[in-house]
């Protein structure tokens, strides 16, 4: 997409990777935020909700796999 900034692109990739952590790990939101490249968990939560439509904790509760 030509209208996407570098930051938007990298955030999208980070959020996609964070979905896997949320589904398959017991890591905290802070640990996941750090693992995917966000320095601030609240910023991660804001970006996640903006892109996915729900906060990461709710996403995890709805999509947890064993």
Region locations from a protein language model:
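Terminal helix-turn-helix DNA-binding modules in bacterial transcription factors
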Residues: 1-39, 61-66
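The DNA-contacting recognition helix of HTH DNA-binding domains
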Residues: 40-42, 46
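…primarily DNA-binding HTH/wHTH and HhH modules…
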Residues: 46-66
